[in-house]
Amino acid sequence: MKFFYLIFSAIFFLADPALVKCSEDCENIFHDNAYLLKLDCEAGRVDPVEYDDISDEEIYEITVDVGVSSEDQEKVAKIIRECIAQVSTQDCTKFSEIYDCYMKKKICNYYPENM
């Protein structure tokens, strides 16, 4: 579940796609995973507080698994840590807020085109 939490992490991107170099596939994956986590949370299957203490090792494993280049892994890890830390909500809206943060920080710029 933590994999989806991090990968989803960018849900309601409203900016003009021409202004941001994020891959549409990446945005869609983040959006869909955030939406599914929100539904699972509302159904009681996911606890949003569970993800507050994700370790650097878990972040590294996830970035490697999805194909983030070695030179971008620390940048992506920093975005993930910052977004999780800045969200104060402890309810199911947390997933949407983290997604918004990821999109603002253009996390998809660091993911491969063929996610």
From Swiss-Prot:
Span of the signal peptide: 1-22
Tissue-wise expression: Salivary gland (at protein level).
Molecular-function GO term, any one: odorant binding
Keywords: Complement system impairing toxin, Disulfide bond, Secreted, Signal, Toxin
GO cellular component: extracellular region
Source taxon at top rank: Eukaryota
Keyword NADP: no
Disulfide cross-links: 26-108, 41-92, 83-101
Cell location: Secreted
Keyword Secreted: yes
Subunit record text: May form multimers.
Protein role: Salivary protein that inhibits the classical pathway of complement system activation in the host while having no inhibitory effect on the alternative or lectin pathways. Prevent cleavage of host C4 and consequently impairs the activation of factors downstream of C4b in the complement cascade.
Miscellaneous: Recombinant protein produced in Pichia pastoris is monomeric in solution and does not inhibit the classical pathway of complement in vitro; however, antibodies against this protein inhibit the anti-complement activity of sand fly salivary gland homogenates.
Protein name per Swiss-Prot or TrEMBL: Salivary anti-complement protein
Phylogenetic placement of the source organism: Eukaryota, Metazoa, Ecdysozoa, Arthropoda, Hexapoda
